[in-house]
Amino acid sequence: MKSNVEKVSNLSRKLNIEVPAAAVQTAFQKIFNGIQKEVTIKGFRKGKAPLATVKSLYGDRVKQDVVQDLIQKHYAEALNEHKLEPISYPEFEFADPTENKDFSFSAAFDVRPEITLKKYEGLEVEKEKAEFDPKKIDQVLENIRASRATFEVVAEDRAVKMGDIAVINFEGFMGGAPLENGSGTDHHLELGAKQFIEGFEDGIVGMKKGETKTLSLKFPDPYHSAELAGKPVEFKVTLNQIKAKVLPELTNEFLATLGGPSDLETLKKSIQEDLEQTETKRIEDAFKNRLLKTLVKENPVEVPPSLMKEQKASLVEDFKKRMSEQGMGPDDFASYVEKWDGDFEKTAAEMIQSSFLVDAIAKKHDLFCKKEDLDAKFAEYAQQTGIEESRIKEFYGRPEQASRLTYMLTEEKVIAFLNKSVKVKEVPAGSLKEENH
């Protein structure tokens, strides 16, 4: 076997391989002989058909099997010979093999970038200071009351206000023409819930029962329907009825119906613990993301094209799934993806770069996930979920799930290592803009 490597780009390689005629003929003979023994051909006993007859009937199938056999064997040998470790699926090119002739094929793939760790200890990273606002407890309590609210028809002659339910008829118009799917009859709209575009609910506030009003508004940009984004629109609105929201009092009797603590002080304490736990997790997750971004910034890594394509496609698919759940159609989705293409690419690049750097740091400091780390995590999951540990192990025995968990635990160990030397700059809560797409 002869082989050579072409450097297509910094991280792309093309491996050219030539298999000698003798090896090709051996592969042909092995496969023809196997078929000859297996098949039954009319006029001959099983396994007794002449080889020439077998070749005439099964030649195309044999060529496919020969290609598979030769590539499977000699591709692996060539990789080992040139000490190559592809990180992408190879793209093979070859012509049909011929008996007693050399067989040439090539494999194109990407390789890992060489990682040079320049600065990863003593990184300076901003972190939000945990500050609990007691008003959030009151907000949760109000949300609980609102979830159990009842509504009563307002008999008095008064204007509708924020918090009321406005029962309306409405018609939308663009350029004087009716807006498709832009009308409703006896629609119950809670003012302040922001169910409609900006300005719609504010425009209804102050109206009285029986009053009709025209609202001149504009669709937001961006908007889930790209063809409407930023366009002016008019809504003709008639207020049919006003319903006032009646909130239950936070009595012990009411609290008992919630299935949790039956006294207010215990409930408040429980709410505070949940809020603090949620906020702590948000701050820690955001800090980890900024730490990894800083790591990438301080240690530039070239991204293999195939991984970029794959990771970006995965991000776009996740985004598509989220948006479709919110009612976005294919045309609108395509417009959004085009608009945010650069953001998808940037995020994909940072994810790939950080994974390479995490791997390099783990290798240098022996931080890779070990069996005891996995066992501890399995036990933790079992305790949290109540699921038998054997079933959890079975789930993570699947290659894809095992790979994800192993990387997650390795990343956790690397983050813990980096946290030992990181220089944290505390900033007020809510002062940092998160970049999530």
Swiss-Prot record:
GO biological process: 'de novo' cotranslational protein folding; cell division; chaperone-mediated protein folding; protein transport; protein unfolding
SUPFAM superfamilies, sorted: FKBP-like (SSF54534), Triger factor/SurA peptide-binding domain-like (SSF109998), Trigger factor ribosome-binding domain (SSF102735)
GO CC terms: cytoplasm
Domain PPIase FKBP-type: 163-248
Subcellular locations according to the entry: Cytoplasm
InterPro entries linked to this entry: PPIase_dom_sf, PPIase_FKBP_dom, Trig_fac, Trigger_fac_C, Trigger_fac_C_sf, Trigger_fac_ribosome-bd_bac, Trigger_fac_ribosome-bd_sf, Trigger_fact/SurA_dom_sf
Taxonomy, superkingdom: Bacteria
Pfam family membership, one: FKBP_C
Enzyme Commission (EC) number: 5.2.1.8
Keywords for the protein's UniProt record, in alphabetical order: Cell cycle, Cell division, Chaperone, Cytoplasm, Isomerase, Rotamase
GO molecular function: peptidyl-prolyl cis-trans isomerase activity; protein folding chaperone; ribosome binding
Disulfide bonds: none
Catalytic reaction equation(s): [protein]-peptidylproline (omega=180) = [protein]-peptidylproline (omega=0)
EC supergroup of this enzyme: isomerase
Gene3D superfamilies: 3.10.50.40, Trigger factor ribosome-binding domain, Trigger factor, C-terminal domain
Function summary: Involved in protein export. Acts as a chaperone by maintaining the newly synthesized protein in an open conformation. Functions as a peptidyl-prolyl cis-trans isomerase.
Comment, domains: Consists of 3 domains; the N-terminus binds the ribosome, the middle domain has PPIase activity, while the C-terminus has intrinsic chaperone activity on its own.
PANTHER family with a match to the protein in the record: TRIGGER FACTOR CHAPERONE AND PEPTIDYL-PROLYL CIS/TRANS ISOMERASE, TRIGGER FACTOR-LIKE PROTEIN TIG, CHLOROPLASTIC
NCBIfam families: tig
Family: Belongs to the FKBP-type PPIase family. Tig subfamily.
Protein's name in the database: Trigger factor
Source species: Bdellovibrio bacteriovorus (strain ATCC 15356 / DSM 50701 / NCIMB 9529 / HD100)
